[in-house]
């Protein structure tokens, strides 16, 4: 059906009234069909003042509307009743999000990237002048850094830096002598043990 704008408006009004009867007045399916029949019965050339709002439809158009309501609202009437009357649990689904806020463009933090400018311009016009406390803090940090560097350099010095060549030679000779004496003593003990073993064997052979 090709309805006019006014007919579409009246049709939507009729549909809204049917849903209102269902949701608010709790009309049953039989009552809704009866109410629709009473409204549509007044459509025609001899319409009464009661259905003045719907006299824009002809009988053929009214029959088309009834056929549409049969296969839509009335066919699924129980579903609409369940939709309007049944209580349902409300499931609230939420997510927690952590939003990191950009730190303020205050010393020593730089401005956000989209607001970035050249270092020369920042140093000349924007960078705040250091306060005495800040200067003292910077000096303390520099002094601490220098002391740490000196300590690390002292630790990395050559461990033999305080000895002369003669001292190193004498130390090596002393260590070598101690090692050689220990080896000679060990060899002498082993030879003595072997000599005693040979002498014992010779004595056994003589007695035999």
From Swiss-Prot:
Expression across tissues is: Testis-specific. Expressed in spermatocytes and round spermatids (at protein level).
Q: MF terms per GO, please?
A: calcium ion binding
One Gene Ontology biological process: sperm flagellum assembly
Q: Please give the Pfam families that the UniProt record associates with this protein.
A: CLAMP
Which keywords describe this protein according to UniProt? Calcium, Cell projection, Cilium, Cytoplasm, Cytoskeleton, Flagellum, Metal-binding
* Localization of this protein: Cytoplasm; Cytoplasm, Cytoskeleton, Microtubule organizing center, Centrosome; Cell projection, Cilium, Flagellum
InterPro entries the record matches: CLAMP (IPR032727)
Gene Ontology CC annotation, any one? sperm flagellum
Function recorded in the entry: Calcium-binding protein. May be involved in the control of sperm flagellar movement.
Q: What is this protein's name?
A: Ciliary-associated calcium-binding coiled-coil protein 1
Species of the source: Mus musculus (Mouse)
Q: Which gene encodes it?
A: Cabcoco1
């Amino acid at each position: 059906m090709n309805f006019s704008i006014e007919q579409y408006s009246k049709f939507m009004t009729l549909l809204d009234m049917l849903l209102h009867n269902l949701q608010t007045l709790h009309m049953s399916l039989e009552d809704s069909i009866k109410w629709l029949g009473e409204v549509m019965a007044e459509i025609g050339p001899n319409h009464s003042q009661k259905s003045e709002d719907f006299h824009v439809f002809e009988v053929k158009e009214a029959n088309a509307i009834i056929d549409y309501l049969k296969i839509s609202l009335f066919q699924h009437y129980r579903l609409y009743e369940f939709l309007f009357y049944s209580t349902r649990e409300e499931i609230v689904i939420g997510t927690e999000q952590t939003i990191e806020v950009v730190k303020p463009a205050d010393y020593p933090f730089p401005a956000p990237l989209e607001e970035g400018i050249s270092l020369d311009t920042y140093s000349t016009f924007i960078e705040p002048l250091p306060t005495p406390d800040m200067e003292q803090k910077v000096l303390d940090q520099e002094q601490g850094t220098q002391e740490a560097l000196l300590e690390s350099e002292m630790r990395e010095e050559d461990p033999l830096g305080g000895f002369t060549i003669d001292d190193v030679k004498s130390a090596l000779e002393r260590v070598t002598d101690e090692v050689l004496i220990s080896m000679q003593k060990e060899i002498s003990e082993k030879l003595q043990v072997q000599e005693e073993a040979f002498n014992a064997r010779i004595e056994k052979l003589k007695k035999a």
